[in-house]
């Protein structure tokens, strides 16, 4: 099975579209870079943008399993491994850009990875993604058998390390890191229900959204309380003051309610079809 074909060897529009969309951010960043649109420190800016998209793609990849269950669309499984490998490619590019930004001084890069905690965990996350990418092909799946699923559960630990790296390296506003963490929390709540074989009913989805919202707010509060000099209570109050824009916890709640609304509308449609049949 190639990146653009399904298990029968036929061209897959779904895989082709997904790959094109996944590579689009890289193409845009490259365009900005070569057209001098990344400011006075283009490599550093490209490094930041690629890192942001690495986390986003990782979260999107983790969202595919619950999305497959919600939509009852098995073909989503076709793009999961491909998107995971693409996420690794972004992570590797992020690391290579860090080397370029360090003037290709590999000794300096190695020492920074050892001495700076956020770089250490970022590098460990990269190693984890490398291992997952190397075993994301059909031959590896067949060879590893049942161990393959166990191995690929490492992705959750990799995500935690990546998000922590994202938090620590953020200099001022950690809202993007909080938002991605909130989405990850939402997906983990879904995973708990799925593991317990609980159906993703509207009530379960609504509960998941509320729980993720609260945990996201707690995460943001805790970070500001422990890692910054900013009053965390001011941040907590901002979650209730929409004049400052939507805070990450609120966005997580709204996004979490979208699947709930989708399932409700789908159930209503099925009921109407049964009544008219």
Language-model segments: which ranges?
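Membrane-embedded alpha-helical bundles that constitute the cytochrome b-like, heme-associated redox core
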Residues: 2-277
């Amino acid at each position: 099975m190639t990146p653009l074909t399904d298990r029968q060897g036929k061209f897959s529009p779904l895989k082709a579209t997904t790959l094109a969309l996944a590579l689009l951010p890289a193409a845009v960043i490259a365009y900005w870079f070569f057209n001098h649109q990344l400011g006075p420190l283009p490599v550093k800016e490209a490094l930041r943008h690629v890192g942001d998209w690495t986390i986003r793609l990782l979260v999107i990849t983790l969202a595919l399993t619950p999305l497959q269950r919600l939509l009852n669309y098995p073909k989503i499984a076709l793009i999961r491994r491909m998107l995971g490998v693409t996420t690794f490619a972004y992570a590797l590019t992020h690391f290579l850009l860090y080397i370029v930004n360090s003037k290709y001084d590999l000794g300096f890069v190695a020492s920074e990875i050892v001495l700076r905690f956020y770089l250490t965990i970022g590098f460990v996350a990269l190693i984890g993604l490398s291992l997952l990418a190397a075993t994301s092909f059909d031959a590896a799946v067949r060879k590893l058998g049942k161990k393959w699923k166990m191995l690929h559960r490492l992705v959750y630990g990799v995500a935690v390390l990546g998000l922590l790296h994202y938090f620590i390296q953020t200099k001022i506003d950690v809202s993007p890191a909080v938002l991605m963490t909130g989405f990850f929390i939402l997906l983990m709540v879904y995973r708990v229900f799925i593991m317990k074989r609980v159906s993703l009913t509207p009530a379960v989805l609504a509960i998941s959204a509320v729980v993720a919202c609260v945990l996201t707010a707690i995460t943001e509060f805790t970070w500001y309380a422990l890692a910054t000099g900013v009053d965390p209570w001011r941040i907590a109050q901002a979650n209730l003051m929409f004049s400052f824009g939507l805070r990450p916890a609120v966005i997580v709640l709204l996004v979490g309610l979208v699947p709930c609304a989708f399932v409700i509308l789908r159930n209503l449609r099925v009921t109407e079809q049964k009544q008219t049949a």
